[in-house]
Amino acid sequence: MIHCKVQQWSPQYLRLPATGYEELTLTLNTSMLARMPEEEDQLFLVVGDSPSSTYVDWGEDCNSTRYPSYDHCTHKILYLGASAGTTRSKRLSATIGIRLSKGTGSNNVLGTPMYLLYNEMKTRIIESSK
């Protein structure tokens, strides 16, 4: 299971519908991102609740207007640091949009919990919500 450092955050999982696309907007506010260590500058969206879970491709801009279609599990990183042209102060509020569609076989994420994480060790900082 994914370790949750912030114990007061209760699990709220995103459950995708049985068919079609689901558009998500993840709003990261100051209190959430302030929990990230200063040296961290990237976020991961993980499908499932296991450390070995795969990642969703969702672009690399912290205010992305791109909505990649999800049809297979890929490992992509959302950068909130210099690579995205942001600074520590600018990253304290960000809204990210992604679009996911039904996968096939083991890549099917429908009804699967999703987590937004801030490091490779899979430390959870916030769960996704509709």
UniProtKB/Swiss-Prot annotation:
GO terms classed as biological process: methylation
Catalyses which reaction(s): [trehalose-6-phosphate synthase]-L-cysteine + S-adenosyl-L-methionine = [trehalose-6-phosphate synthase]-S-methyl-L-cysteine + S-adenosyl-L-homocysteine + H(+)
pH dependence per the UniProt record: Optimum pH is 7.
EC number: 2.1.1.318
Keywords, in A-Z order: Methyltransferase, S-adenosyl-L-methionine, Transferase
Enzyme class: transferase
Disrupted gene: phenotype observed: Exhibits almost 50% reduction in intracellular trehalose concentration.
Temperature dependence: Optimum temperature is 30 degrees Celsius.
GO MF term set: methyltransferase activity
Top-rank taxon, per record: Eukaryota
Biological role: S-adenosyl-L-methionine-dependent protein-cysteine S-methyltransferase with broad substrate specificity. Methylates trehalose-6-phosphate synthase (TPS), enhancing its enzymatic activity and promoting trehalose synthesis upon entry of cells into stationary phase.
The name this protein goes by in its record: Cysteine methyltransferase
